[in-house]
C-alpha cells in the first residue's frame, strides 16, 4: 500500500493541474454563452461552500474559536473574493492561454511578500527568477496591448489575472499561522462560506436577471465543471499530493495547468498563441522554477546550524 502512495500522489497532482488547466477554456466558453464573470464567481463560491460543508460532515471535527472564524473572513477576502473575482473577470476579458500563464506567477509574488512580511532572504536565484518572471509578464501584457484581438489577449484582463495571484500570495503570507492550525476541509468550508456571504449581496440581483430559459445546457455543464472539478476536486487532489511529495516535486506540476489550458484553448479556437507569447511563457516558467528552487530561510538556518555543529565537533 505504501508503495502506491507516491504514484497516487503524482496522479492527484497531475489531475489538479489538468482540472485547473481545463477550467480556463471551459469557464471562458461558459462566459461566452449566457453568463458573465460575476455570475460564474457567484456560482463557484456558493457551490464550493456547499460541497466543502457537506464533506466536513464526514471528516474529523475541528474546534474553531470565534476569533479564528472571523480571521477566516479576512483570509477568504484575499484567497477567494479578490482572487476569484479578479481572475474570473480577467478571464472574461482576455484569452484562456494568457490567464493560465499568469497563474504560474504566484510563487514570485509569494517570494517578494515573504521578503517584505516574513523577512525571508532573497538569494541571487530568487532575484533572477523575479526579473525573468516580470520580463515574461511584461511581454504578455505588451502583446495583448498591441493585438486588438481578445483571442490573443487583453491588457486589462491580463492585469486582473496577475492581480489575482498577488491577492492569493498576500493570503499565504498574512495567514500562514492560521493555515497551519487546521485541515484543508475546515479552512475551505469557512473561507467559501465567508466568500459567499461577502459576494452574493452584490451579485444576487445580477444572477437573478439571467435569462435562464435561454442559457444553453452546455453552459450549465461548464459551470458545474468549474465548481466540481476546478474548485472542489482540484483542491482535494492538490492536498493529497502535498501531503506525500516534497514541495519541489509539487512545484513541477504548476506547469501542467498552462500547458493543458493553452493546448485546449488553441485547439478549440478560444485563443491564438504567438511566438512572443511562447517566449514570455518560457521566461515566466523559468523565473518561477528559480524562485521555487531557491533556499528558504529555514533551509539557510538549518545549513548554518549544521556548519556550526561541525565546527564545534571538528
Task: Name these PLM-found stretches.
Residues 1-43, 150-177, 197, 201, ...:
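Glycine-/small-residue-enriched transmembrane alpha-helix faces in small-molecule transporters
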Residues 5-9, 34-42, 64-70, 142-170, ...:
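Juxtamembrane helix-entry segments on the extracytoplasmic side of multipass membrane proteins
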Residues 52, 73, 113, 122-144, ...:
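Hydrophobic transmembrane alpha-helices of multi-pass small-molecule transport proteins
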Residues 11, 40-43, 80, 84, ...:
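Helix-helix packing/entry segments at the starts of transmembrane helices
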Residues 2, 41, 45, 142-143, ...:
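C-terminal-most transmembrane helix of multi-pass membrane proteins
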Residues 29-82, 109, 167-174, 189-208, ...:
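Transmembrane alpha-helices of multi-pass small-molecule transport proteins
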Residues 19, 23-24, 53-103, 139, ...:
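Specific transmembrane alpha-helical segments of multi-pass solute transporters/efflux pumps
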Residues 47-51, 102-116, 131, 194-198, ...:
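Alpha-helical transmembrane segments of compact multi-pass small-molecule transporters, enriched
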Amino acid at each position: 500500500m505504501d508503495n502506491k502512495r507516491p504514484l497516487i500522489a503524482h496522479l492527484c497532482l497531475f489531475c489538479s493541474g489538468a482540472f485547473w488547466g481545463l477550467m480556463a477554456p471551459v469557464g471562458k466558453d461558459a462566459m461566452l454563452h449566457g453568463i458573465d464573470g460575476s455570475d460564474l464567481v457567484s456560482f463557484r463560491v456558493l457551490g464550493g461552500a456547499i460541497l466543502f460543508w457537506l464533506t466536513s460532515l464526514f471528516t474529523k471535527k475541528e474546534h474553531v474559536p470565534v476569533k479564528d472564524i472571523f480571521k477566516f473572513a479576512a483570509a477568504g477576502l484575499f484567497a477567494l473574493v479578490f482572487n476569484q473575482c479578479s481572475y474570473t473577470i480577467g478571464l472574461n476579458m482576455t484569452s484562456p492561454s494568457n490567464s493560465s500563464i499568469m497563474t504560474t506567477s504566484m510563487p514570485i509574488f509569494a517570494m517578494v511578500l515573504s521578503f517584505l512580511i516574513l523577512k525571508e532572504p532573497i538569494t541571487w536565484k530568487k532575484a533572477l527568477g523575479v526579473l525573468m518572471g516580470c520580463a515574461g509578464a511584461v511581454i504578455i501584457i505588451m502583446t495583448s496591448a498591441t493585438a486588438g484581438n481578445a483571442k490573443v489577449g487583453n491588457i486589462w484582463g491580463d492585469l486582473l489575472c496577475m492581480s489575482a495571484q498577488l491577492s492569493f500570495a498576500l493570503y499565504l503570507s498574512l495567514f500562514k499561522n492560521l493555515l497551519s492550525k487546521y485541515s484543508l476541509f475546515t479552512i475551505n468550508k469557512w473561507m467559501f462560506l465567508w466568500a459567499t456571504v461577502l459576494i452574493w449581496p452584490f451579485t444576487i440581483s445580477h444572477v437573478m436577471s439571467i435569462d435562464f430559459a435561454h442559457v444553453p445546457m452546455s453552459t450549465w455543464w461548464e459551470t458545474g465543471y468549474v465548481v466540481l472539478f476546478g474548485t472542489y476536486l482540484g483542491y482535494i487532489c492538490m492536498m493529497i499530493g502535498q501531503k506525500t511529495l516534497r514541495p519541489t516535486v509539487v512545484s513541477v506540476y504548476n506547469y501542467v495547468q498552462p500547458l493543458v489550458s493553452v493546448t485546449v484553448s488553441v485547439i478549440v479556437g478560444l485563443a491564438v498563441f504567438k511566438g512572443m507569447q511562447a517566449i514570455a511563457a518560457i521566461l515566466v516558467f523559468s523565473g518561477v522554477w528559480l524562485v521555487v528552487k531557491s533556499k528558504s530561510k529555514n533551509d539557510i538556518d538549518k545549513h548554518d546550524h549544521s556548519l556550526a555543529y561541525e565546527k564545534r565537533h571538528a
